[in-house]
Amino acid sequence: YWPAYMSNLAETAKPMINYIDDMRYYGRIAAKEYAGIESKDGQENGWLVHTQATPFGWTTPGWNYYWGWSPAANAWMMQNVYDYYKFTKDETYLKEKIYPMLKETAKFWNSFLHYDQASDRWVSSPSYSPEHGTITIGNTFDQSLVWQLFHDYMEVANHLNVDKDLVTEVKAKFDKLKPLHINKEGRIKEWYEEDSPQFTNEGIENNHRHVSHLVGLFPGTLFSKDQAEYLEAARATLNHRGDGGTGWSKANKIN
């Protein structure tokens, strides 16, 4: 859906938004079972989805956590949803459709994040970089997507002048997500712990097709032209990873 808005086809994104909105119903079941976050009748306390979904309510990780567990997928979807407003400026749609979705997703992460004292971060845990490497806490992929979600949620809530208490809680965690770090080779870290002697490089491929740790560069807005060191590290990351991969990852790298 990346081209839908930029090609002036925002109306083609509405079925996607409706699909995600409907997914929240079953996603609340997944949030209860996998994260202990319960929404009783009429409540919208958080929903969960991973790398697979169907029109029939599939929101669980699948049969292999290595590629299936991806709780920040809900945050990534919200970026596509919020983009509708950024391109159309439809205030009614923002208030009635988009904001409730953003709010519930932000509430999930406000509850699900764990504080890691060693790194002074609020982290996603457990955390997999999609189909690559080992399990960690607070990897760059998850942290970047939650950063984007919280950024967008606070922007909308402040614009609508609503839910000040939740915004305050989200802001406190947002400031300690700390998604971007540069490793000793001058590249963006994919895993926070990767320079540690205890870090295992099991399953790591230098030319892996995904560059999940650059999700904040595209399609996210985490990187800034005023942060030259991160942009140079991102360039080094792309050069190191190479141009191989399947269709989706090639499009991601090109963008």
Functional labels for PLM-detected ranges:
Residues 39-52:
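Carboxylate-rich helix-loop segments that flank metal/cofactor sites and access channels
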Residues 88, 94-108, 116:
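Serine-hydrolase-like catalytic core of hydrolytic proteins
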